Amino acid sequence: MSEQKRTPIFTEYASHGAKTIDFGGWDLPVQFSSIKHEHEVTRTKAGLFDVSHMGEISVKGPKSESFLQYVLTNDISKLEPGKAQYTIMCYEDGGTVDDLIVYKLDDEDYLLVVNAANTEKDANWIKQKNTYSNDEIVIEDVSNQYVQLAIQGPKAVEILQKCTDENVQEIKFFRFKNNVALKGIEAKALISRTGYTGEDGFEIYIDASSGVALWKLLLEKGEANGLEPIGLGARDTLRFEANLALYGQELSKDISPIEAGLGFAVKVNKGPDFIGKEVLKNQVENGTDRKLVGIEMIDKGIPRHEYEVLKDNKEIGFITSGTQSPTLNKNVGLALINISYTEIGTEVDVKVRKRILKAKIVPTPFYKRGR
């Protein structure tokens, strides 16, 4: 069995009481205090996440834009340096390779941030699809060069501002600043107004050698604002409430972005052809047989990943993610089900272990900031 991978921040976990687990081959903190507490801290104050396990793939060269237009579903011709974009890679049959964020660093320089468990698969897939020469495009997995930390929550702006003379408030949503100087830290950082919690906040990319120093700086400057380190457990409940897809659950090689409600990131009418376009265009124009919906339990029980959803004793789909929502204090889930049963208010059943429990279709997201 291969040894578990660890991020450069691993050495800091124990002093904060972290309980670690194996997450896709990585030794990562599932929680520091409790999932519910960490969830609440992020929603009301601010949370600090070590997300250095995420993958980074560099795509550079004069043909990088035209190549990325071919492998990504969104339209990156809309990007200018300093802008980021949520996008997806699909197979020819419309299934999902991965969802990711692309950063345009310069006209011929892009950084793709992909899901940790998919990094090697994604890098190989991208290289396999490339038909350009090395003079035209260079693709490199640069994951080991970066530490990625996320600071999320209503106090995130105030805390990060204490760490730099750069005005972070003026970084708009899905925009970023590169080469930002941080107080007392050697390496410069890329600071992006993005996140995976449904809260305001930033994702910060810095050279791996300065990662621990950045972690300590943020916790020190954020102490007065109630900043705490947050584990994977709360990261999952936060993203779930905000209806942010998780690869392997809401998206997979068998689930298209259109089925998952991510059509906003699939530009079927952009000029260049892209992988999966034909199938995805058909799904956009003619609809899909399945759709991702919200489910709220009527009977007592928690809907978990892969539990069956039934109507009149017939299977109509399955739960992709589910939990007791810390914000709503309700048992809710996301489910991919037959399009005929997706109207809000429709009653369905969920098979929780051997019990058949009542539930109903409800709107998503379960949580929206400021609402």
From Swiss-Prot:
<keyword id="KW-0032">Aminotransferase</keyword>
<comment type="function">
    <text>The glycine cleavage system catalyzes the degradation of glycine.</text>
</comment>
<dbReference type="InterPro" id="IPR027266">
    <property type="entry name" value="TrmE/GcvT_dom1"/>
</dbReference>
<dbReference type="InterPro" id="IPR028896">
    <property type="entry name" value="GcvT/YgfZ/DmdA"/>
</dbReference>
<dbReference type="GO" id="GO:0005829">
    <property type="term" value="C:cytosol"/>
</dbReference>
<dbReference type="GO" id="GO:0008483">
    <property type="term" value="F:transaminase activity"/>
</dbReference>
<dbReference type="InterPro" id="IPR006223">
    <property type="entry name" value="GCS_T"/>
</dbReference>
<dbReference type="InterPro" id="IPR029043">
    <property type="entry name" value="GcvT/YgfZ_C"/>
</dbReference>
<dbReference type="InterPro" id="IPR006222">
    <property type="entry name" value="GCV_T_N"/>
</dbReference>
<comment type="similarity">
    <text>Belongs to the GcvT family.</text>
</comment>
<keyword id="KW-0808">Transferase</keyword>
<dbReference type="InterPro" id="IPR022903">
    <property type="entry name" value="GCS_T_bac"/>
</dbReference>
<dbReference type="InterPro" id="IPR013977">
    <property type="entry name" value="GCST_C"/>
</dbReference>
<dbReference type="GO" id="GO:0004047">
    <property type="term" value="F:aminomethyltransferase activity"/>
</dbReference>
<dbReference type="Pfam" id="PF01571">
    <property type="entry name" value="GCV_T"/>
</dbReference>
<protein>
    <recommendedName>
        <fullName>Aminomethyltransferase</fullName>
        <ecNumber>2.1.2.10</ecNumber>
    </recommendedName>
</protein>
<dbReference type="GO" id="GO:0019464">
    <property type="term" value="P:glycine decarboxylation via glycine cleavage system"/>
</dbReference>
<dbReference type="Pfam" id="PF08669">
    <property type="entry name" value="GCV_T_C"/>
</dbReference>
<dbReference type="GO" id="GO:0005960">
    <property type="term" value="C:glycine cleavage complex"/>
</dbReference>
<comment type="subunit">
    <text>The glycine cleavage system is composed of four proteins: P, T, L and H.</text>
</comment>
